[in-house]
Amino acid sequence: ETLFMDDIIQKAHLDREIDAVLAGVTTVLDAGAGAGRFSIPLAKRGFEVTHLDISDSMLAKAREMAEAAGVADRMVFVKSRITELAGYPNGSFDLVICVDAPVSYVYPKHNQVLGDFVRIARKAVVVSVASRLGFFPYWYNPAQKHQYLVDQDVDDSIMKWYPLPTDETWEGWRPDFEDQRRFLDTGLLEDPDVVFAKMERGETPWPVTYCFLPEELARVLREAGLQNVRLSGPGALSRTIPQPLLKKLLFNPTLRQKFLDICYEFDSHPSVCGMGKDTVVASGVKG
């Protein structure tokens, strides 16, 4: 959240989605929990949290942060893939959350994983996935991430994946209509074989990515047994705002919360749920 302003907006939105389903919740599974951006705050609030991730480094960092926060005794750390939940009985956790879109990185098992989340949740599920319609405009804007930079001169290794645009960037850009049509039809950002080859060469940090349509996500969750499914698209408003104004809105203390409130209301409207910055968020309850 110190590098990109869209992370601030996404986190604020997801916090509210999670808060809305916490009534009666004691136990939480955070699947694909990373360094504990959501699991540790929930543990601080008194919930019993299972923090599941496949990365040793993320688990180690999360443990360290949980200990520093004094909540390690309320957390269980599990090394596992989100595709390996078959061992958990039905209703193992009151709430299952999976945010920052790890479900989109387990293609072709994405629907299976969503079904597992619903199965092992007793009360509610909150999940975010990559958005097909939200991603599509990036085909026409190679510099889309720079709109959200907190500091245009930031020196961070992650920026090698987001090079600053130059005159050559725009002059050399050509639309690939065939690839764009393929993406709209399949939801796959790239051919899986191409992605695997790039990963082997160190040319991308991202695995095969499957991007959902909003109604597709809702259908899969409903068929698995989730009720009152609510969809939203965090970032639908902010992606229309120039970087200097975004920075003013988010870093002026008198404006920040009012702006985040407006973002949440706008981004939750059914008409824009597919046009979030990167993700579609879905939440729902068990009967």
Place the predicted regions along the sequence by residue:
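Class I SAM-dependent methyltransferase "Motif I" SAM/SAH-binding loop
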Residues: 32-34
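A short glycine-rich, Lys/Arg-flanked "PGG" loop and its adjoining helix->strand segment in the class I
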Residues: 111-124
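A short SAM/SAH-binding and catalytic strip from SAM-dependent methyltransferases
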Residues: 95-109
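Class I SAM-dependent methyltransferase SAM/SAH-binding core
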Residues: 40-84
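Conserved class I S-adenosyl-L-methionine
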Residues: 1-23, 37, 126-187
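Short alpha-helix
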Residues: 208-225, 231
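A short acidic, Gly/Pro-enriched loop at the edge of an enzyme's catalytic core
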Residues: 87-95
